[in-house]
Amino acid sequence: MGSLEKERTTTGWAARDPSGVLSPYTYSLRNTGPEDLYIKVLSCGICHSDIHQIKNDLGMSHYPMVPGHEVVGEVLEVGSEVTKYRVGDRVGTGIVVGCCRSCSPCNSDQEQYCNKKIWNYNDVYTDGKPTQGGFAGEIVVGERFVVKIPDGLESEQAAPLMCAGVTVYRPLVRFGLKQSGLRGGILGLGGVGHMGVKIAKAMGHHVTVISSSDKKRTEALEHLGADAYLVSSDENGMKEATDSLDYVFDTIPVVHPLEPYLALLKLDGKLILTGVINAPLQFISPMVMLESITGSFIGSMKETEEMLEFCKEKGLTSQIEVIKMDYVNTALERLEKNDVRYRFVVDVVGSKLD
């Protein structure tokens, strides 16, 4: 058992201002309580939303900020009331580390929609301390907000699944799109998009990758196993694909028109938005008279557990580039340029942090 109310320090890499440049930062972890796990971080993925946060693109950033919400680690200590985990377990945690536990979303295992949820970084915990993310040596997380990483799934492979994997898996299940034989589109072939191809194919779907240019065609068809490739600027190709898809996953994290992709949907088809965009959506209303624009935000811890088991059963892994922490600023610059196939993962435990 762990010692209750024990405060420790750790070193992470933090942004100090909207330049988004990260550098070593030593800080106090929040007190570890009876329901908490004290975790050594092994690996942490880099998500495009980390860039939005460290650069204050959403106008809500507080500094110093240690980013990282695709975290896999090893349990070093457990609180006296922890029942599901023990020292030595390999666990994952994501972007939500607190909720009210009493609202409708919390009571229906959808805690990520709780209005009082606490983000794993760039937020304030119940004790008044700022939350900090997984680009750090250690973290403290409540038992409710971690999941066991299945044996046989490497830590660096599991990390992106904590965000990118469940972001795709959750809406397919939630919106009744899990059955085989469906035809789906994946708009954008990045960290989330490439997992979209893999998970949809594993569910038995016919998958079309939609991209702004032809340069990812070989990757999509030969390496990821997509069935078709569509260039959004190809008017003839887009016209031929009209009314052909049951759903389109829109993973693009910047402002873009929606009408071209609504036109690809069958009647009652769904355009599922997962990219973080800091601007109002614009579309012509007749385009959605018999289709739907909807969205999805990561997944609950229960859905994350289901997704990990699904990936284990199907042998799915993310395609990653593993880096050390001293390369993280270069990696963030490359990510902004879409120069990664398909997710950076920081080898935190193998990095010099101070």
Swiss-Prot record:
The cofactor binding remark recorded in the entry reads: Binds 2 Zn(2+) ions per subunit.
Q: What's this protein's function?
A: Involved in lignin biosynthesis. Catalyzes the final step specific for the production of lignin monomers. Catalyzes the NADPH-dependent reduction of coniferaldehyde, 5-hydroxyconiferaldehyde, sinapaldehyde, 4-coumaraldehyde and caffeyl aldehyde to their respective alcohols.
Keyword vocabulary terms for this entry: Lignin biosynthesis, Metal-binding, NADP, Oxidoreductase, Zinc
- PROSITE patterns, per database record: ADH_ZINC
Could you provide one GO biological process annotation from this protein's UniProt record? lignin biosynthetic process
Q: Which reaction does it catalyse?
A: (E)-cinnamyl alcohol + NADP(+) = (E)-cinnamaldehyde + NADPH + H(+); (E)-coniferol + NADP(+) = (E)-coniferaldehyde + NADPH + H(+); (E)-sinapyl alcohol + NADP(+) = (E)-sinapaldehyde + NADPH + H(+); (E)-4-coumaroyl alcohol + NADP(+) = (E)-4-coumaraldehyde + NADPH + H(+)
What InterPro entries does this protein's entry cite?
ADH-like_C, ADH-like_N, ADH_Zn_CS, CAD-like, GroES-like_sf, NAD(P)-bd_dom_sf, PKS_ER
Q: In which pathway does it act?
A: Aromatic compound metabolism; phenylpropanoid biosynthesis
Q: What is this protein called?
A: Probable cinnamyl alcohol dehydrogenase 1
Keyword tRNA processing attached: no
Give the superkingdom in one word.
Eukaryota
Report the SUPFAM superfamilies cross-referenced here: GroES-like (SSF50129), NAD(P)-binding Rossmann-fold domains (SSF51735)
Known cofactor(s): Zn(2+)
**Family designation:** Belongs to the zinc-containing alcohol dehydrogenase family.
Instruction: Indicate whether Oxidoreductase appears among the record's keywords.
Output: yes
Binding residues for Zn(2+) 1 = C47, H69, E70, C163
Q: Look up and give the organism this protein is from.
A: Eucalyptus gunnii
Report the EC code(s) recorded for this entry: 1.1.1.195
Self-association and partners? Homodimer.
Q: Where does Zn(2+) 2 bind?
A: C100, C103, C106, C114
Q: Which GO terms describe its molecular function?
A: cinnamyl-alcohol dehydrogenase activity; coniferyl-alcohol dehydrogenase activity; zinc ion binding
Positions of NADP(+) binding: 49, 167, 188-193, 211-216, 251, 275, 296-298
